[in-house]
Structure formats: structure tokens, C-alpha cells
């Protein structure tokens, strides 16, 4: 399971708090879709966007996320924001995971641990 927590950081903006939160969440939705593709992350993914009061804003952020993920060839399913403000989604796993792709079988324990490849040491 992958969990993503969105925060404003230092980006507090010059507009109202609600508008700043909305803008940050929209930007985060696009970037999350990009990072999921780049890192080939699959399985269950939970996103904790910054709390938004306006239902239209919440719906738009989920819509932006769905649009950004539509560019991905990997099948995804995005569910509406829950009462706790979480977006749950699934993304089909394709290929091996990050650890498996960047490591070799340990010659001492025969696969019970990992030895990272020389290129990432």
C-alpha cells in the first residue's frame, strides 16, 4: 500500500486560504499521477489531500486526478473523496517492484535479503 500526504509547505499563496488549498491540491493531483507513472507504483494507493470545505473543489481535484491518470496506459480506478478527506485508488501492478528491479539475490542467504546493485551504492 502506498500512502501520499499532501501539504502546502511554504506555498501559502496570496489569495484566500480556501483558494490556495484548492490550487495546491490540483497541482498535487497532477504531480501524483506523474510520479505514479515514473515510479511504476501499483496496488492500493491512498491520497490525503489538504482538507477542502467546498464540495465542488473536492470533486474537481478528483476529476483532475482522473484526467491526469487517463494519460497512463496502466489501468487505474479512482474512488470519490471519503468523509475523512481521503482518495482511495488502485493501479494495476505491472512488472517487478522497485526493490526487486534494483537488487540482486543475496548469495549468502539465497534470496532472503537484498544486495543492491553497484550502480546505486
Give names to the regions the model predicted.
Residues 1-121:
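Conserved glycine-centered short motifs in functionally critical loops
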